[in-house]
A protein has these predicted regions:
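A short, Trp-centered hydrophobic/proline-enriched beta-strand micro-motif
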Residues: 60-68, 112
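A structural signal for short hydrophobic beta-strand segments in well-ordered beta-sheet cores
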Residues: 82-85
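A glycine-rich, basic-preceded beta-loop-alpha segment at the flavin cofactor/substrate interface
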Residues: 11, 131-141, 151-167
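Structural signature of FAD isoalloxazine-binding scaffolds in flavoprotein oxidoreductases
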Residues: 6-16, 76-80, 156, 162
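A short core secondary-structure module
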Residues: 30, 94-138
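Internal helix-loop-helix
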Residues: 1-60, 101-108
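Short Gly/Pro-enriched turn/cap motifs at secondary-structure boundaries
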Residues: 57, 72-75, 99-102, 115-118, ...
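Short glycine/proline-enriched turns and hinge-like loops at secondary-structure junctions
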Residues: 7-8, 76-78, 89, 102-107, ...
Length: 167
């Protein structure tokens, strides 16, 4: 329906395992693209978002990233510092995510943000950000010990204006 193979996780995992046996970095990149970016849009996005982004991601024309991890909180979404503040019909996103696969090479990123007080319940929202949005940049590539073929860097958000339709 959205351009994918139609395979489920029972078929996907053995394929990913085979790819990873040859080159673990490629397996990591495939998993970040498919499981983290694409799957979140598929499972939690609305139909308009699925039709807009999934065919491009499934074809490989667009590479996806997932942004949750932060410098001081790791993957604790309740303590994240990246914020999204409503401004009319848009949201303004500020903060940074680190250790993000495809932060440099990715064309879009599903990014988790805090929309309320730190630690409060129901205070996080995901947004799809596209490369080229003003204020949306990536940091330098991390010099890792292993998995070097899977690039990792920081995502930086400096007053990024995002339409509500990307939420």
């Amino acid at each position: 329906e959205y351009g994918g193979s139609g395979l489920g996780y029972q078929e996907y995992v053995p394929i990913l395992n085979e790819v990873s046996q040859v080159e673990p970095s490629h397996g990591l990149s495939v998993a970040a693209h498919n499981s983290l970016c694409m799957n979140h849009i598929y499972e939690f996005g609305n139909e308009e978002q699925r039709r807009k982004w999934l065919p491009q991601l499934a074809s490989g024309k667009v590479i996806g990233a997932w942004g949750l991890t932060e410098h001081n909180t790791g993957s604790d979404s309740g303590g994240m510092s990246t914020t999204a503040v409503k401004d009319g019909d848009d949201w303004i996103i500020n903060g940074a995510k680190n250790f993000i696969t495809h932060a440099i090479s990715g064309d879009i990123a599903v990014v988790m943000t805090r929309t309320g007080e730190k630690g409060a319940k129901n205070n996080s929202t995901a947004f799809v950000l596209e490369k080229g949005m003003a204020g949306f940049t990536s940091g330098k590539k991390e010099n890792k010990l292993g998995m070097r073929a899977s690039e990792t860097a920081e995502l930086i958000f400096d007053n990024v204006r995002v339409p509500d339709s990307h939420r």
